UniProtKB/Swiss-Prot annotation:
RCC1 repeats lie at residues 34-84, 85-136, 138-189, 191-257, 258-311, 312-362, 363-416. Residues 1-31 are annotated as: Disordered. The modification Phosphoserine is found at S11. This is Regulator of chromosome condensation. It comes from the Eukaryota. GO terms for molecular function: guanyl-nucleotide exchange factor activity; nucleosomal DNA binding. PANTHER family: REGULATOR OF CHROMOSOME CONDENSATION. PROSITE patterns: RCC1_1, RCC1_2, RCC1_3. Pfam families: WD40_RLD. Guanine-nucleotide releasing factor that promotes the exchange of Ran-bound GDP by GTP, and thereby plays an important role in RAN-mediated functions in nuclear import and mitosis. Contributes to the generation of high levels of chromosome-associated, GTP-bound RAN, which is important for mitotic spindle assembly and normal progress through mitosis. Via its role in maintaining high levels of GTP-bound RAN in the nucleus, contributes to the release of cargo proteins from importins after nuclear import. Involved in the regulation of onset of chromosome condensation in the S phase. Residues 1-10, 19-30 have a biased composition (Basic residues). GO terms for cellular component: chromosome; cytoplasm; nucleus. The modification N-methylproline is found at P2.
């Protein structure tokens, strides 16, 4: 009897294969500890979330209606909060669509309102007039608009802003989103960096200076269609893969899987840690961050300064020094390398506003320094602080601070009651 012929399995047609399996993405930057939201500073467009009658707070104030918040981010003139169940709330300026929701009812932008998203969100980021949300399966939704020096350039399509969330088209699941003033950085599961938005200062890391102004001949698509930042790996045939990425106002920092720090964007006050002050349009391996004894774990950039931290919980600053924004004491001058902020306890996170700096200590206190004009320091005064000052206030009593985020004129704290910790 002849042997039975085993029928060869026909491979399914290409389009029948699901493009990407449903994955649950995770990254160490995703926050899970729930808390309450406090805001302070200037709130003339509703970015404090305290209603139409409160346009300024010199001390942290509790934002009503928000509970179990795991992430609170300050954009330029708006605030975005993510709660434990993956829902997004926003408040503040909605002129360009940064809130992602209808605010036609007068005053509705001044209090927290829900952004309609069907998916569970695990991370949010906010820029000057845009907001991004990362879902648990690695998709990114975006709303608002990006601007350059001449005005609006669009969001995902030239000159078109979006008042509601739209999905960013990418083939690869994203694990982290980070926003500069007018650019977005997405880190994928594969360790690739995709960037979009304004590229004038080099912050996209993939658009040469020649085309940085509105994309050259290719037009705005060159800037607004997310593309990968390609960087050849020395000594091997592949490309550099990244484990983390952070944004300043006009710059981007990325940490490779080997632990090297790369940066691109504006460095007119050495805020990238470059020896010169030229903008960097392609990723630079930043030798000023090379030190065999420590690894860098956090970066935050203001308008012209950077605050960063190492794995030992020490905070450093570099860049422009005016108004005390480096936290290095009275009379400190501009720094081109990370310089230790010695008057701080062990820190768990750092943050920047436009001209201010913050550090949250391991024991849950928050320290602030820099320009006092907008009451963002929580001292109750409008004087500048050249060294870190511990923030105090009624709403901080018997509470620990989880995180801090700061925008152009306002600051947002995530706190929880001491009993729970």
């Amino acid at each position: 009897m002849p042997p039975k012929r085993i029928a060869k399995r026909r491979s399914p047609p290409e389009d029948a294969i699901p493009k990407s399996k449903k994955v649950k993405v995770s990254h160490r930057s995703h926050k899970t500890e729930p808390g309450l939201v406090l805001t302070l500073g200037q709130g003339d467009v509703g970015q404090l979330g305290l209603g139409e009658s409160v346009l300024e707070r010199k001390k942290p104030a509790l934002v009503p209606l928000l509970q179990d918040v795991v992430q609170a981010e300050a954009g330029g003139m708006h605030t975005v909060c993510l709660n434990q169940s993956g829902q997004v709330y926003s408040f503040g300026c909605n002129d360009e669509g940064a809130l992602g929701r209808d605010t036609s009812v007068e005053g509705s932008e001044m209090v927290p309102g829900k952004v309609e998203l069907q998916e569970k969100v695990v991370q949010v980021s906010a820029g000057d007039s845009h907001t991004a949300a990362l879902t648990e399966d690695g998709r990114v939704f975006l709303w608002g608009s990006f601007r350059d020096n001449n005005g609006v350039i669009g969001l995902l399509e030239p000159m078109k802003k979006s008042m509601v969330p739209v999905q960013v088209q990418l083939d690869m699941p994203v694990v982290k989103v980070a926003s500069g003033n007018d650019h977005l950085v997405m880190l994928t599961t594969d360790g690739d960096l995709y960037t979009l938005g304004c590229g004038e200062q080099g912050q996209l890391g993939r658009v040469p200076e020649l085309f940085a102004n509105r994309g050259g001949r290719q037009g705005l698509e060159r800037l607004l269609v997310p593309k990968c930042v390609l960087l050849k790996s020395r000594g091997s045939r592949g490309r550099v893969r990244f484990q983390d990425a952070f944004c300043g106002a006009y710059l981007t920092f990325a940490i490779s899987r080997e632990g090297h720090v790369y940066g691109f964007g504006l460095s007119n006050y050495h805020q990238l840690g470059t020896p010169g002050t030229a903008s960097c349009f392609i990723p630079q391996n930043l030798t000023s961050f090379k030190n065999s004894t420590k690894s860098w774990v956090g970066f935050s950039g203001g308008q012209h300064h950077t605050i960063c931290m190492d794995s030992e919980g020490k905070a450093y600053s570099l860049g422009r020094a005016e108004y005390g924004r480096l936290g290095l004491g009275e009379g400190a001058e501009e720094k081109s390398i990370p310089t230790l902020i010695s008057r701080l306890p062990v820190v768990s996170s750092v943050a920047c506003g436009a001209s201010v700096g913050y550090a949250v200590s391991k024991d849950g206190r928050v320290f602030a320094w820099g320009m006092g004009t907008n009451y963002q320091l929580g001292t109750g005064q409008d004087e500048d602080a050249w060294s870190p000052v511990e923030m105090t206030g009624k709403q901080l009593e018997n509470r620990v601070v989880l995180t801090v985020s700061s925008g152009g004129q306002h600051t947002v704290l995530l706190v929880k009651d001491k009993e729970q910790s």
